[in-house]
Amino acid sequence: MKYIPPLNFSPVVSTDVSLYRSGYPMPLNYSFIKHQLHLKTIIYIGDKDRPLEEYQSFLESEKIKYYHIFMDSSRDEGIQERMNQVLHLVLDVRNYPILVHSNKGKHRVGVVVGIIRKLLQGWSTAGICQEYGLFSGGMKDGVDLEFITMFETNLKIPRNVIPGFAKHCLYLNELEAAEGSDDESGSESILTAKQPI
C-alpha cells in the first residue's frame, strides 16, 4: 500500500516521543496517519469551525483526541493564551504521538513550532527563522517571527508528565516543595520565558 503524508508534513521531535507538523489532512492521507503515525492526539491551529465530516469520522474511528485552537494570525486577541493551551498539550507525555496542523502547514503551525523550538529545544532565532521560511516557501512573516521572539509564558506543568525532550530546556525550572509540606506540593515544574528588560 502506498502511504501519502499530509501537505508540508515533517517530524518536529522524534526522540522519546513523536511530534509532527503538517497541513490539513485529506482522505488520501488517512492511511499514512493510521499506519505510520499511530497518533493519540491531533491539535488543529486554524480558523475552520469544525473538522470536515470525513475527517471527523476518521478521528472517531481511530480514537484520536482532537483539539481545535482557533488562530487566524499571530495578531489575534488572546493568542498568548491559545499558545499556552498548545504548550500544555505538548508538555504532557500522555498525549503522544501528536500531530499539530494548520490549513497549509505554513504560517500558523510555523508559529507553534517556532515557540516549541525556542522554549523547549533551545533553538536560535536564526534557526527558527530558517525553518519558518523553509515551510512557508521563503515567505517570512515579520509579525509571526516577532511574536515567536517576544513570546512570554509562565506555565505550571506536573513533573511526571513532561516529555524527556523538554526536561532539560533552559526555561523549565523545578518548583521546590515548601518546607513541611506534603510530597505532592513540589510535584510541578514551571515553564517561564520572560523578555529581558
From Swiss-Prot:
GO molecular function, one term: inositol diphosphate tetrakisphosphate diphosphatase activity
One Pfam entry name: Y_phosphatase2
Entry annotated with the keyword tRNA-binding: no
Residues covered by the Tyrosine-protein phosphatase domain: 10-160
This protein's UniProt keywords: Cytoplasm, Hydrolase, Phosphoprotein
Modification Phosphoserine occurs at: 181
PROSITE patterns from the UniProt entry: TYR_PHOSPHATASE_DUAL
Keyword Hydrolase among record annotations: yes
InterPro entries: Prot-tyrosine_phosphatase-like (IPR029021), Siw14-like (IPR004861), TYR_PHOSPHATASE_DUAL_dom (IPR020422)
Function: Required for normal growth in the presence of linoleic acid hydroperoxide (LoaOOH).
Extra facts: Present with 4530 molecules/cell in log phase SD medium.
Name by which UniProt lists this protein: Tyrosine-protein phosphatase-like protein OCA2
